[in-house]
Amino acid sequence: MKDTAKKPILVIMAAGMGSRFGGLKQIEAVGPAGEAILDYSLFDAHRAGFETVVFIIKHAIEDAFKSTVGAHAEKAGLNVRYAYQELDILPEGFTVPEGRIKPWGTAHAILSAADVIDAPFAVINADDYYGRTCFELIYNYLSAGHTGPKYPWVMVGYLLGNTVSTNGSVSRG
């Protein structure tokens, strides 16, 4: 295995249960050979230079995820790590409120992966398409060492008008 300890890592939030969608959208086949949207992101990220990927998933979807997207990533030569987003992974002194069943969101997902992230990293959603340019921009930025107190965070942004579909709106529930 290559030494990838200091090369940028791609962290992918893929723990969603797809309740509105009706299934696991992060592994749903959309491409002509059964590719998921995430497979396209992994391809583009790998071409941009990312060698290590951390999938943040739930134990409930582990088998389905590992046998599809996880297997594709490993076959493509990516170093794959897993982190598990569970409700009880919280900072010291915090507890899960009685009756809480939904995950805490983005920050909690990243916290869940803290033990397997050991280098500068980029975060994406498993069910969004970003395109190769996005991965090239973020990989090159992180590789250039733009981290530390002066540059603690970075994001790739897009003009809203360039991202809205002409085919209609998206309902968030």
PLM regions and their residue ranges:
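Short beta-strand segments
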Residues: 13-14, 81-83, 123-125, 152-159
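Short glycine-enriched, charge-decorated loop/helix-capping segments at active-site entrances
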Residues: 25-31, 96-100, 170-171
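Short phosphate-binding loop-to-helix
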Residues: 74-120
